[in-house]
Swiss-Prot record:
CDD domains from the UniProt entry: ASKHA_NBD_HSP70_DnaK-like
Name of the protein described by the UniProt record: Chaperone protein DnaK
Compositional bias per record (Polar residues), positions renumbered to this chain: 579-593
Residue positions, PTM Phosphothreonine: T174
Domain of life of the organism encoding this protein: Bacteria
Amino acid sequence: MAKIVGIDLGTTNSLIAYLEGGRPTIIPNAEGSRLTPSVVAFTKDGQLLVGEPAKRQAIVNAERTIKSIKRHMGTNYKVKIDDKEYTPQEISAMILRKLKKDAEAYLGEPIEKAVITVPAYFSDAQRQATKDAGAIAGLEVVRIINEPTAAALAYGLDKEGHQKILVFDLGGGTFDVSILEIGEGVFEVIATAGNNRLGGDDFDERIVNWLVEMFMEEHGINLKEDRTALQRLFEAAEKAKIELSSKLQTEINLPFIAMKGNTPLHISVTLTRAKFEELTYDLVEKTKEPTERALKDAGLSPSQIDKIILVGGATRMPCIQEWIKKHFGKEPQRNVNPDEAVALGAAIQAGVIGGEIRDIVLVDVTPLSLGIETLGGVFTKIIERNTPIPVSKSQIFTTAADYQTSVEIHVLQGERALAKDNISLGRFILDGIPPAPRGVPQIEVTFDIDVNGIVHVSARDKATGREQRITISNAIRLSEEEIKRMTEEAKRFEEEDRKRREEIETKNQAEHLIYTARKTLKDYGDKVSKDLVQRVEDKIKNLEELIKPERINVEQVKKGMEELTQALGEIGQFMYQSASAAGNPGQGQTNENPGGKTIDGDYKVN
């Protein structure tokens, strides 16, 4: 049976893991790193870069480099490069395809199935977009699992006894907090809360804004209007944030960040940890409300939490750790790698699904309530948040006007009292209802949430017993045709990458052959005929011309290499024959001239 891998598709970094001997293991990427930056870039010559290569060139190619695309999943956001628009699903698929390809090279076998993690507070549209991204990348997503739940699996795999644990997950772009009960192989989520618009990126942005404001005051130049300068600022801000987790202050030096007239301008400032915490105080405060809500929903006080697990690189910030320690009265666990826990947990869940791990039961919950819009724009809940999944619930609705033959049902997800303040999942048209006074028809609407947290809805007219087929008119979701088209486009990118690699390898081989040919002429040119030397030089010049373009014709270059190799072979043959003749005086040499100087024209090479 082919391996099922676990993937943490992160805002800042992504990871892929698998089970080896019953233990989850991170798979390194082609660059040798366990973390793959969630960055995609399109070079001006049409090359696609993903991961570290894309991140390295971001400063010089800021307008064609995409990062933090996860923050746009489940929206109609588009990335425009040249004349083509890309959805968040397509960009995410490029990251997934990179992970898949590198893992296949590492494991030496094809990968077709994966468990992919998402923030616990992801909506239905965001979860569906993640599944679509997997499909475009050529992966069957066998399960969508919440990130805090995955981290809990990684923590609790070998733990004995019963524990109540809180997973505090502050990633690059999202924040989740989940409370679980674990014991005897059962991992049960009892409450979850979060904020999909809060993460490490926001902390970086506060540093950037501080630098921009200072520079504006001093020089009157807005650095946010320069994409390249802004990219440099964000990279410096991220580096400063990381350094301040272990240092009390850090230096930010950005030479030649702008020009004023003919004068270059620089940034050179010291950022202290105290100043950083002042700039980001309100962001830390934003983590408190979801934490309190999760505790309240679970019916627990902070003192009843046995262990606290930190997930996400942003939890390394001292201000986060200090708040947690103060609020819960205990130190968070240090034996879980915050960058890797989610991917490791996804690999464990993959092992459960694949039958490699037994005696583990995972019970997750829906993070948001589900319901419909009713008269007056009110949001009527049908499935409450933190309900264990999978789940199915039904409710009877009726018409609001006399003799209605159709109704529009607006399905929503959220916690607000009014429909307009919640997340719209789609509008369902149910027609064919027999005419009757208002309040008489009985329409049974059923909500199903599967193990992936994805919502399915059906409706049935109880009077006729006829079940109506309902289609979600949600423009954000991709159709099967769109997924198929995007999958084919992704394959074309893969084919283009293969061609590009072949061009580079062929060009390198040609350059090496040219170097060898020139060295051969230097060493032996005076020992062979001028005609042969000229032919070799002509072949060298021809090959040099063939490899001049940015995009070479591989077949033509290979032919040129073959011709040059053949000409070099004639030199080798000549030298071999000369050496043989020199070593045998009975064949064309006399003892009066040992080794005999070769004279042009003595040999004719056929």
